[in-house]
């Protein structure tokens, strides 16, 4: 993938993150902490529903794309099993609509359930259609499909604010539904030829079984990973006030700016590394990429630590602790991104069943720490638990991949990852000593990165120059 295509794919995450950074303060000023906490529950619920109903077939689509001649048949074989499961679960859950709403949002309003269900359906179909654009390397279309729903969400919130519509959770839900519906329409238009061809293709039950054999282990792993990701939300929902969940949600939303890096890299990395493997390329390049990604992770953390105090000027007074929480909240997306490089051997060797045990251990670490820390420290306990669990997750994925595929030097990687976790926790504790303390810490860390990664930076610059040719 050349530089032009990389930039096309980068446009979506960058634009979406920029719009997200605008939307978060607007939501914080316009809606209560409790409603923002409920919006976080909605996001987590949609994620869980997708993980279950996808049956791992979205990953199977990516894995088999370059090895399959009949791509419409591949799309159909991956789409229909999950769609049937989604419809069955929707019918079963509809019987308990009010009870589910009470459990999720603290209010027994059946309307909340139905809107949540519509959000899940639109997100499910959009996920598969987005894979078409991703695998065809249609970066600009893929990016615009990410930016447009963010614009719709921001516009909907603006309408709520300026027209005097009641600023309550129902309005937030409808804004979220409008954004997911918009992206579905955009994806459907951009991939109309592909899904129409898939619709006309003949079903092949044997082929579907083959794909399920690859994806099925990822279902359990995915649900456990959802637990790893959502433990903070769940424990805050039941062990702390909704206001603490709202504080955590805003912090996580700002930290989601790191998802620019995660999203761009993930979109590019999976097709690239599988293409390398299929072409018999030198897979020693994976180690070089891992060091360059680690360098980027360190720089992102340092810059965020230096400038996180700016959140005080963007958010209401009740969110003043966000600047201390945000560094810990950055660790999960960054560790996941780094692990995508170091664990590539698991996917190449098709030993995906191992991911279940890796994720389970990290999930249990998160649960145990969250149960201990969240009741005492609220959002602060949640971000520390989450960050620690993701470091465990990263290290286990790396070690397993090294054992079953190719071994590579890891001491430097582990040293900097441990140092990053320690510094983020120190930043959280420095709230007693003022802003200048943690800013000074990260200012000292940045030159250290330059010293230890100067060779990797040079190699990365050379690679970028080469891609322009």
Model-derived features: positions:
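Signature of the first transmembrane helix
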Residues: 2-58, 86-94, 119, 154, ...
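Interhelical loop/hinge segments that connect adjacent transmembrane helices in multipass membrane
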Residues: 2, 166-173, 185-229, 272-284, ...
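Hydrophobic transmembrane helix module of multi-pass membrane transport proteins
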Residues: 80-221
């Amino acid at each position: 993938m050349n530089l032009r295509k990389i930039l096309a794919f980068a446009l979506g995450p960058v634009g979406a993150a920029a719009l997200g950074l605008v939307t978060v303060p607007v939501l914080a000023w316009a809606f209560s902490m409790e409603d923002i906490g409920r919006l976080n529950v909605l996001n987590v619920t949609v994620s869980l529903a997708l993980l279950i109903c996808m049956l791992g077939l979205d990953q199977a689509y990516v894995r088999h794309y370059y090895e399959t001649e009949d791509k419409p048949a591949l799309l159909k074989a991956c789409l229909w099993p999950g769609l049937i499961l989604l419809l069955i679960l929707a019918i079963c859950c509809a019987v308990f609509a009010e009870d589910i709403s009470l459990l999720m949002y603290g209010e027994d309003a059946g309307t909340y359930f139905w809107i949540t269900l519509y959000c899940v359906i639109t997100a499910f179909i959009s996920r598969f259609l987005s894979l078409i654009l991703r695998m065809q390397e249609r970066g600009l279309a893929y990016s615009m499909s990410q930016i447009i729903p963010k614009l719709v969400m921001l516009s909907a919130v603006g309408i709520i604010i300026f027209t005097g519509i009641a600023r309550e959770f129902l309005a937030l839900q409808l804004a979220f539904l409008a954004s997911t519906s918009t992206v579905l329409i955009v994806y459907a238009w951009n991939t109309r030829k592909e899904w129409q061809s898939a619709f006309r293709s003949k079903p092949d039950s044997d082929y579907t079984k083959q794909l399920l054999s690859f994806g099925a282990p990822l279902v359990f792993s995915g649900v456990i990973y959802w637990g790893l990701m959502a433990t903070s939300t769940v424990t805050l929902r039941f062990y702390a006030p909704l206001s603490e969940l709202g504080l955590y949600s805003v912090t996580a939303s700002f930290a989601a700016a790191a998802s620019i890096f995660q999203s761009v890299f993930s979109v590019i990395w999976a097709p690239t590394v599988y293409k390398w493997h299929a072409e018999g390329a030198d897979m020693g390049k994976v180690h070089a990429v891992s060091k360059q990604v680690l360098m980027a992770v360190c720089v992102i953390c340092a810059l965020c630590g230096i400038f996180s105090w700016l959140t005080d000027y963007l958010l209401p007074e009740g969110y003043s602790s966000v600047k201390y929480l945000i560094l810990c909240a950055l660790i999960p997306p960054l560790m996941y991104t780094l692990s995508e490089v170091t664990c590539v051997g698991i996917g190449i060797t098709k030993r995906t069943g191992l991911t279940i045990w890796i994720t389970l251990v990290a999930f249990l670490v998160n649960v145990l720490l969250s149960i201990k820390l969240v009741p005492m420290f609220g959002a602060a306990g949640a971000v520390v638990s989450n960050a620690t669990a993701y470091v465990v997750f990263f290290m286990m994925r790396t070690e397993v991949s090294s054992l079953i595929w190719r071994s590579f030097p890891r001491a430097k990687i582990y040293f900097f990852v441990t140092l990053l976790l320690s510094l983020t926790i120190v930043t959280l504790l420095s709230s007693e000593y003022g802003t200048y303390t943690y800013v000074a810490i990260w200012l000292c860390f940045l030159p250290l990165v330059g010293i230890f990664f100067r060779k990797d930076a040079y190699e990365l610059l050379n690679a970028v120059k080469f891609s322009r040719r």
